[in-house]
């Protein structure tokens, strides 16, 4: 964990998430094995500290982290947060990660069906999954975290139940059993095929409709041409909308672009320019 924490601090500014994960691991050991461990937490903290201190961007690496923490905590700094720091509507929480919800349900059902006890690994993955779900409920930027830990939890459950699952499959796949229940198997497989085909068709139609409703690719052509004609080469265009940057950049390599920065970072770097942008937009 020491070298991992060091590399994590260099590669990802949200690397401090390693600390609560190691705490959850220690809690899992305490609950399942009745022993208290502290070394993983200490090594993770030491690795992260070294990574932030022995860093080509030091001390900006620490300032960058400090400016991000208010967004995570939800306290704010008076600057309107970026869209990624808003939470999804309740139904969107399911729509965006419905596969993860189904996978979580499958993991819980497998545990219940086979009456599995919680091992250290399974409990850790479950606690980490719960933590990531809370972060996901907090802000949409954590949408990529939670499904990954759901997959880890479900994989851990399947691993624990692998012996029982294999026995069940062998029993169901026995030729005598298949012959006895051939009508049930035929109905099940036919129904599964129909459901999969219908779901694929609905998804294809929905995707086509969404693509047709996208903004036209040439929506910023006139603005790009105007900037080329009326601004010096390599002059900076201040644009905080990351989703409009590809369209602008595609039509204009004449200018330099400031795009996609979190509003807090933009404000700290150049407060007057950010306030001007806010007033103009």
Give each language-model segment a name.
Residues 63-103:
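Juxtamembrane membrane-water interface segments that cap and precede transmembrane helices
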Residues 32-42, 96-97, 107-128:
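Membrane-interface helix-loop-helix junctions at transmembrane boundaries of multi-pass membrane enzymes
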Residues 18-46, 160:
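Perimembrane helix-loop-helix junctions
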Residues 32, 36-40, 161-185:
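Membrane-interfacial, low-structure loops and terminal tails that flank and connect transmembrane helices
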Residues 45-65:
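Membrane-lumen/periplasm interface segments of specific transmembrane helices
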Residues 170-232, 242-245, 263-265, 269-281:
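Membrane-proximal, lumen/periplasm-facing interface regions of secretory-pathway glyco-
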Residues 1-13, 22, 47-52, 130-136:
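Membrane-interface alpha helices of multi-pass inner-membrane proteins
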Residues 17, 135-174:
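Hydrophobic/aromatic-rich transmembrane helices and adjacent perimembrane loops
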């Amino acid at each position: 964990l020491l070298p991992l924490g060091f590399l994590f601090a260099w590669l990802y500014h949200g690397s401090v998430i390693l600390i609560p994960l190691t705490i959850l691991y220690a809690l899992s050991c305490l609950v399942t094995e009745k022993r208290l461990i502290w070394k993983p937490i200490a090594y993770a903290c030491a690795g992260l500290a070294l990574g932030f201190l022995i860093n080509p961007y030091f001390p900006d690496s620490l300032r960058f982290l400090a400016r991000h923490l208010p967004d995570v905590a939800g306290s704010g700094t008076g600057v309107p947060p970026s869209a990624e720091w808003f939470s999804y509507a309740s139904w969107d929480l399911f729509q965006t990660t419905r596969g993860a919800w189904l996978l979580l349900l499958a993991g819980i059902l497998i545990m219940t069906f086979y009456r599995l006890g919680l091992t250290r690994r399974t409990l850790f993955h479950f606690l980490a999954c719960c933590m990531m779900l809370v972060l996901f409920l907090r802000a949409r930027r954590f949408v990529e975290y939670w499904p990954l830990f759901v997959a880890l939890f479900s994989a851990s459950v399947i691993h624990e139940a692998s012996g029982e699952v294999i026995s069940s499959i062998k029993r169901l796949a026995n030729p005598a059993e298949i012959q006895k229940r051939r009508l049930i198997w035929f109905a099940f497989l036919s129904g599964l095929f129909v459901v999969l085909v219908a779901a694929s068709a609905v998804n294809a139609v929905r995707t086509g409709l969404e693509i047709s409703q996208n903004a036209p690719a040439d929506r910023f052509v006139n603005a790009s041409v105007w900037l080329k004609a009326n601004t010096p080469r390599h002059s900076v265009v201040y644009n905080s909308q990351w989703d409009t940057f590809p369209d602008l950049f595609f039509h204009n390599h004449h200018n330099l672009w400031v795009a996609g920065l979190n509003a807090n970072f933009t404000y700290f770097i150049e407060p007057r320019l950010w306030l001007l942008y806010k007033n103009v937009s």
